[in-house]
Amino acid sequence: MERRFASQTVVITGGCRGIGEGIAERFGREGANLVLVSNAERVHETAARLVADTGAEVLPLVVDITDEAAVADLYAQAEARFGRIDVSVQNAGIITIDAFDRMPREDFDRVLQVNTTGVWLCCREAAKRMVAAGHGGRLINTSSGQGRQGFIYTPHYAASKMGVIGITQSLAHELARHGITVNAFCPGIIESEMWDYNDRVWGEILSTPEKRYGQGELMTEWVGNIPMKRAGTPADVAGLVAFLASADAAYITGQAINVDGGLIMS
């Protein structure tokens, strides 16, 4: 695989599983230094696996991305270790599923704190350092198909991901003069732990006495609505993210690009 990102440093939040791990593996195979961020200790296991599989240098960090001081410290550590920050992928995210009239306020607030405020804090800190260094950079944010249109039992998640697109477009205007592009991607159904949870909980809520969903059945039904007739993989998403981080995407900014097999066409 071409080493397009040799000597570049890529920060990836939510990097120890699912889409984030797939993105990290892609950048590692293309020569980047990796800063792998998660709120879970398992990030160290993922980092060790990436070193073995890709040969990349990896700095694993356990960070709460809703903590402003902790976010500043993570970028300081990244810069101290590798000397610069070229790409920052704001991928950390959470979801809960419940009817809006039963949803605890704590769930609503926490989803927005992680999915939207966390993205803003990381973009802000990464951009400060990119501007100061004067070499431009790439900010890439994880939105969702629900950033395009809301869905049942997840109003807080939809709001959080629509907010990510708003942040992306606003910062794209503000940072263009510094040579920093800001884009988002909107995954659909992607094989991951999050979608295992989605399949189980949505399946429980949407089941009726006439039709009960077993494990995997709801996801299979929904995949049938995708023109390409399959769920996506983290590697499918990683290919787009690597493109947006590359020199080939230097004139692309402020965009939110669907990665969903054609489920949402816009």
Which residues are covered by each model-predicted region?
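Alpha-helical segment proximal to the catalytic Tyr-Lys
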Residues: 128, 173-174, 250
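Substrate-binding pocket helix/loop in short-chain dehydrogenase/reductase
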Residues: 99-100, 104-112, 222
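Active-site helix of classical SDR
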Residues: 123, 160, 168
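Conserved glycine-rich Rossmann-like NAD(P)H-binding loop of the short-chain dehydrogenase/reductase
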Residues: 30-46
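Conserved glycine-rich cofactor-binding loop
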Residues: 9, 16-17
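Short, small/polar-rich loop/turn modules that mediate ligand/substrate recognition or access, typified
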Residues: 176, 181, 252-254
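Residue(s) in the substrate-gating loop at a strand-loop-helix junction
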Residues: 144
